[in-house]
Structure formats: C-alpha cells, structure tokens
Design a protein with these regions (language model features):
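Active-site-proximal beta-strand elements of phosphoester/diester hydrolases
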Residues: 6-14, 118-125, 222-226
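Core catalytic region of metal-dependent phosphoesterases/phosphodiesterases
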Residues: 2-6, 10, 15-114
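Conserved hydrophobic/aromatic beta-strand scaffold that supports enzyme active sites
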Residues: 111, 121, 234-236
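Active-site-proximal loop/helix segment associated with metal-binding centers of metalloenzymes
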Residues: 124-186
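Active-site environment of divalent metal-dependent phosphoester hydrolases
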Residues: 16-18, 52-55, 85-95, 127-129, ...
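Short His-Asn-centered micro-motif
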Residues: 85-88, 108, 122, 205-206, ...
Length: 249
C-alpha cells in the first residue's frame, strides 16, 4: 500500500463552462485524476475557480457536479485533507464544503510549511500591479451586503444572470493580449515584492491559466497551475520539490 505523503495542487477547472457535454467530460477527467492521486495524496489543494460559478443559498446549491463532489467525499472519508480556495468565479463559497466534505475554505492566502519547505498559496486574483477595476469589484462582490442582496434573488434568475456574467467576463479577458511569462508577469512582480520581506520556497497560484515554473531567486520559485479546460495541468510536492504535470496528455 502506497504511503500518502504527497501534496497535490490544481485550479481553474471551471466546471459548468462551455456546453453540458464539455463540462461533463472535464468532470469525468477530474474524477479519473482524483482516482489516480488517491493512493499517495496526503492533502489536495483546489486553488480557486473550481466552478465557473458557485453560490450557496441557505438551503440550495447549484445543480450538477455530483460525480466530482462524490469523489471528493470519498477522498475525505479516506483521510485525505481537502482545501478549497475561493477564486474570482466561485468566491461565494460559504460552509457547504466544510460541512459535507470536511474541507477547509480559504478566502485569500494560505501560508504553510511542509517537510521544511515554506509555501505561499493564493488563487492569484487581485494581486500585483494594475487591474484596479477588478480589485474594486472584488471588494463589492465579497461584501456581506452584496451577498445578502444576491441571496434574495430566486436561484432560477440569480444563477442564470451570474452564468451570463461569467461567460461575458471570460470573453472580455480572452480578447485582451496576455502578458508574456517572465519578469513582467504580474504575479511574478507580486512575488518579487513579497520576497523582499518574507521567505518562501514555493509561491503557488492559479488564475492566470498559464502553467509556469519560474525561478525567482536561488531558493524561491513561482508556480502557476494552469487550467483544466485545455491543459489539464497540476503540481505535486513529493516532500523534496514541486513539479508540474499534465494529466492524460
């Protein structure tokens, strides 16, 4: 029997985006991935935008994703620690996954130390220079007032409007020229500034949809997890180092 000692990191599944068939295919792929890692995973970090939209009403959650959630429950029941990070598409997670899966919900950053290595973990949205309009919107969307007002809307209307907004937001972002990976990558800028006052071996993010492994200095590396719409990339810490991998590619 394999020893469960590895940390797995993945983000930006965007379950629910595209057609029902494409989202279901992505979900089935994720279930196969979770089956694969179950043998040696100690902890699984799902680092934001797991869903293309998510809102927890008091007694209602979005339909679908039952195979994915069932597999997560299986991992949790087997003693594997689950972490859910809020992303910009699924920031309205509250306590459902804590109650049903025993997961820990992370709203912003998480700092951990494992096997003598220090990690800084964050979905990646709203960090670094620029993007001031999104940072303004994020403050509004995360406010208790905004969440309370949205909860007053019937799910048939509220979820429909939110899904439209999510699709529109993605089209706008895809139409923008992306920055080239390297020193000008905005999360690299954020990491460089952070490392002036703190030390981390690994700074791991999602959000950018770019699988990246960039050396920041002699001891620190920036890892971006990519996404699962096309790349199906993820990272693994085996107790010594972090590596990027691609599932079924």
């Amino acid at each position: 029997m394999a020893i469960r000692n590895k940390l797995y990191f993945a983000s930006d599944f965007h379950l629910g985006t595209g057609t029902y068939a494409s989202s279901r295919e992505r979900e089935d792929r994720l279930v196969r991935w979770l089956d694969m890692i179950k043998a040696d995973a100690a902890e699984v970090f799902l680092m934001g935008d797991v869903f293309d939209f998510w809102f927890e009403y008091k007694t209602v959650v979005p339909r679908g994703y039952i195979r994915f959630l069932g597999k997560l429950a299986e991992l949790s029941d087997a003693g594997i620690k689950l972490w859910f990070f809020k992303g910009n598409h699924d920031m309205w997670m509250f306590d459902y996954f804590e109650q049903e899966l025993g997961a820990t919900i992370i709203s912003n950053e998480l700092e951990i130390e494992r096997s003598g290595k220090k990690f800084y973990l964050h979905h990646g949205d709203g960090l670094g220079p620029g993007d001031t309009f999104y940072k303004f919107l994020k403050g509004i969307f995360r406010s208790k007032l905004c969440q309370w007002l949205f909860a007053r809307i019937h799910p048939n209307l509220g979820v429909g409007v939110a899904n439209y907004w999510s699709r529109h937001s993605r089209k706008v972002n895809l139409s923008k020229p992306d920055s080239k990976p390297g020193e000008q990558e905005w999360l690299v800028t954020f990491c460089t500034q952070l490392l002036q006052t703190h030390f981390y071996d690994y700074l791991i993010f999602g959000h950018r949809h770019l699988p990246l492994d960039i050396k920041l200095n002699d001891k620190s590396r920036y890892i971006n997890l990519g996404e699962w719409v096309t790349a199906c990339s993820y990272a693994v810490f085996d107790g010594e180092t972090v590596q990027l991998f691609y599932f079924e590619k």
